């Protein structure tokens, strides 16, 4: 009896890739919850949130229980960050993206992003305190090595198979920054626990995130869900469908006369 969730960000209208993710979640859960991941105030808009509800209703996908809106739970994420800080598991990082990219021979993580070299992890505590007091812009990063010592060896469950965890492959992941009070990694993992999600379904592009999320679950004492990742829908050039690249929206398909059944078939 699995509880799944569909968790889009209201940063644009849904496209066929979202339809696949939603149908996959509903198909594999006896209960499927809806969560709006709207922690990026610069990109998320109420009109897009309303559009998500409209598209799901058109596809006859009715979520179980109330919709969880992440921007309404910022205090919960702050409490998690404070708890991690008290245990010495997060630290302020003052490096810019340009600093990280410019690091000599900077390797890349599973998500393709340059790995953080750890410069601020070992910063002199007095200098760190001075920069914080001055109000210097910074992010909060998870000290992955310290968290792994606390958690010990970990595995996660993917389609019934145990997979060894390698969260160190991500480097010290950002858990919060000034323009985002908490990161996707922290919010999604926290909310899956709070909402009682037992099966996390999502696209192949997020498979590697399970390693980091399992570490967060272990250090926070959150339940461990099962994971199941689905293939991505690709465009004619072999790239995954995305809002940024102007993928055709479900609203546009509806206005062009496609039926829900036709969209469902295309999304499979």
PLM segments and residue spans:
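N-terminal Rossmann-like or analogous alpha/beta NTP/dinucleotide-binding catalytic cores
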Residues: 1-110, 204-205, 209-222
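Basic, alpha-helical terminal appendages of large translation-related enzymes
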Residues: 1-7, 33-34, 64-68, 72-75, ...
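Active-site cores that bind ATP or allylic diphosphates and position pyrophosphate for catalysis
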Residues: 99-242, 249-254
């Amino acid at each position: 009896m699995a509880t799944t969730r569909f968790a889009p960000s209201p940063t644009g209208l849904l496209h066929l890739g979202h339809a696949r993710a939603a149908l996959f979640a509903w198909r594999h859960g006896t209960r499927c919850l809806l969560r709006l991941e709207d922690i990026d105030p610069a990109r998320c808009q109420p009109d897009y949130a309303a559009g998500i509800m409209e598209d799901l209703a058109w596809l006859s996908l009715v979520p179980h229980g109330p919709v969880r809106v992440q921007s309404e739970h910022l205090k919960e994420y702050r409490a998690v960050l404070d708890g991690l800080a008290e245990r010495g598991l997060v630290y302020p990082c003052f490096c810019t993206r340009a600093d990280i990219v410019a690091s000599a021979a900077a390797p890349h993580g599973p998500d393709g992003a340059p790995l953080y070299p750890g410069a601020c992890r070992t910063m002199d505590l007095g200098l760190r305190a001075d920069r914080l007091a001055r109000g210097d812009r910074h992010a909060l990063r998870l000290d992955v090595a310290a968290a792994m010592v606390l958690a010990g060896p970990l595995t996660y469950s993917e389609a019934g198979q145990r997979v060894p965890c390698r969260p160190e492959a991500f480097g010290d992941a950002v858990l919060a920054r000034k323009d985002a009070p908490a990161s996707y990694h922290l919010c999604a993992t926290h909310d899956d626990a709070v909402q009682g999600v037992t099966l996390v379904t999502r696209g192949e592009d997020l498979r590697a995130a399970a390693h980091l999320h399992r570490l967060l679950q272990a250090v926070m004492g959150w339940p461990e869900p099962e994971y199941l990742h689905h293939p991505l829908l690709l465009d004619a050039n072999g790239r995954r469908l995305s809002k940024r690249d102007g993928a055709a929206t479900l609203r546009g398909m509806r206005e062009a006369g496609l039926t829900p059944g036709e969209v469902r078939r295309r999304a499979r």
